[in-house]
Amino acid sequence: HRDLHSFPTRRSSDLGSEETCIGSAEELTAGIEKSIEAGFMTENPYEGFVAGDNSKENYNKIDLHKPYIDKVVLVSPSGKPMYREPDLIDVWFDSGAMPYAQHHYPFENSEKYNPATGKGVFPADFIAEGVDQTRGWFFTLHAIATMIDESVAFKNIISNGLVLDKNGNKMSKRLGNAVDPFSSIEKYGSDPLRWYMITNAQPWDNLKFDIEGVEEVKRKFFGTLYNTYNFFALYANVDEFRYSEAEIPVAQRPELDRWILSLLNSLIREVGDSYESYEPTRAGRAISEFVTENLSNWFVRLSRKRYWGGEYSTDKISAYQTLFTCLLNVAKLMAPIAPFYADLLYTDLNRVAGSEPDQSVHLADFPVFDETLIDKDLEEKMDIAQKVSSMILALRRKEKQKVRQPLAKIMVPVLNPHFREQFEAVKNIILAEVNVKEVEYLTDAAGIIKKKIKPNFKTLGPKYGKLMKEIAGAINQFGQAEIAAFETSGSYTITAGNEPVTLAAEDVEIQTEDIPGWIVATEGQITVALDINVTEELKLEGIAREFINKIQNLRKDNNFEVTDRIVLTIQKHEKTDEAVIRHKDYICAQTLANGLELTDKLNSPNAREAEIDKDVVTLILVERQL
């Protein structure tokens, strides 16, 4: 109640020739006794109050607020009556005294105040309010702290931005663009709503709120994390994984495991630094990318076969331990932003392993990164694998070529020996991911892959002004050798205005031209060419992979367990029979089939149609092996 607090200054009755400021209840009660002796007061309204007794019971005996405090008349050094100053100071000064008033400082808790070292409760670590508090609370906190301690009152400050509608307009009932937060929480949950708001804009920036963004966050981040945990739980239950085995040393784990654990520890460091520097947006975005792009879309997808069937090998245990560690740490990292889902994930994981001593993620210690597990070279190699795979898959989409259709070859120009070494280390991962048989390295691609170069006027103009046209003309004259040299070094020096000018990669745009039978893509310094010719042998293997996909879907439709063995019957078709016969063992192995029979006519009511290729439809019967 700021308006009820009195201004503690007292002035003498002769227009304030004498004044004093009362600094404590003890000083006030002592002044009252003198006033009674001088005849200005007849009784002590704070009778029974014991100076120095800081108990709540003692302070309940007195009331220092208006109007009671106005009945107190004190005595000046010269014997004049002194009355409370009736004027008001800015009421925000009352709020500015909060750091001291909340702990009854300096009369109690002095050990909590050490501005010189910054330890204790003062100065505060963090404060957040609207920008209007620049002249209000923010100012009075600093003003009082400066007067008392010659110190700042807080170390970090955020002025919250506004929540606007998706078009950047202020929300209002009149315009009909206001979003009801309670119905949004009811529909999507508080964690997805909070995650969207934190990751979509920095807290100090205005947020253009779009409910479709909340839907996307719930689907893409929380949905992906939920599916990743479900995948883990499904196979962990099958194999009765409880993390009871001895921990496999990270150095002895497969490269894929070491990579994701390296990324995890890099993530722990980045998220910890982000929270420490009050940048939750950076933390949330890093966690989202790790979960969706690296953990789910890369590690789990490339590791799936390690969890399927087979013996409980060291490789399978490593896969379980690695995924468990990632999920557990993600729960801890996301807890400040998504407290409810993080706690659910944490407790579910702890039921599996029981390795965590705390009942809640909010009681657990924040993760600490292990520098020895961070392998930047391995991260770079896997980044190449991800980029190249993404480029090739994009080329497949461009050609409307299904990933299940194997292709023969990719060609990759080699810029330097180190790049070739890194590419070779992840070659098999790339080939498996994009379903291509082999890679050919080109040490001199100039005669095979043709490139074009164009000046980037957006960067050249601000950098070089009047020289831009001359520089652009020189760039347009580059041949294949100059382009190759530019790509290799990342820069190129020309002469313009009779002066040497060094161009950076951002100053040009390099494009690749397709060659007959191939399609080509370039991203940064990486170029790939994909052979799009499909031989008869590749066609047959593609058909076999289509059968595998359709059979797996039928297993799911029939609610088979992942460990159930099956028997397959396929109706003959002139365009698919050879593929089934040639790749029978492969189809059976991939679908857990103990047998596969081709039949002229499949009459079972449980048989299902399957479109294997355009205008190629046959029947498949999937039965559980009894």
Predicted regions: what is each one?
Residues 199:
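Structured mid-domain segments that build the active-site/substrate or prosthetic-cofactor binding neighborhood
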Residues 106, 110:
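Aromatic-residue-lined binding/catalytic grooves and analogous aromatic/hydrophobic interfacial grooves
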Residues 115-121:
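Short, surface-exposed loop/turn microsegments at beta-strand edges and helix-strand junctions
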Residues 1-5:
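Short, exposed "boundary/linker" segments that immediately precede the start
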Residues 6, 10-99, 105, 148-186, ...:
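Feature 926 captures the class I aminoacyl-tRNA synthetase adenylation module centered on the KMSKS loop
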Residues 140-147:
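Short Ser/Thr-interspersed hydrophobic loop/turn segments at strand-loop and sheet-helix junctions
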